[in-house]
Amino acid sequence: YSMPWRDNFCETRTSNRTSPLCSLNKVHQGQDLRTGTATECLQMRAQSPRERGLHEAVATEDGIIQYIGSYSLQLKGTETGFIYSYVHLNMRRLQVSVMDTVKAGDVIGVVSNDFGGTPTTYHLHFEIKAPVEGEGIVHVPPYTSLVSAYERREGGIGRVVEDETVEVASAPVIVDPSWLID
């Protein structure tokens, strides 16, 4: 996935989505992870929709595929009960079906630009819904959990980008450490 990453949970968007963890309405409820370089994305655009996809999307934890839509799927974790949404997958190349049981790390599909018949940029939009005391099941910030998983895989701490040219669309949300998935 393309680096640097930045947290874009709670960014202002046009859709009327809310989260009790965001101070604004009309917010982004997940984390966008860009895939590939500009050259790789141009090469994918030349491919048929069935072929498109550069990076695999994998199961976050052991669980059951509970929903497959026109451009997304949902995995419910068996240990945590968290619901993970994987959006903009190549729906023609899914490796799973509804009610399939998966293990953490199993390939479920490939990231593409599907958006219900309208293409978007090549990226994975990743969401986590989890229980938050007093709020019920709500969208929670996935960014720190993704960074933690990356650092575990790489066997070390990631590099913080201090470049002032990387803009942040909205202020990051300070989250309760109990919401993080290790």
Please report, for each region that a protein language model flagged, where it lies by residue:
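Conserved, short, structured surface segments that act as functional micro-motifs
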Residues: 76, 82, 100-181
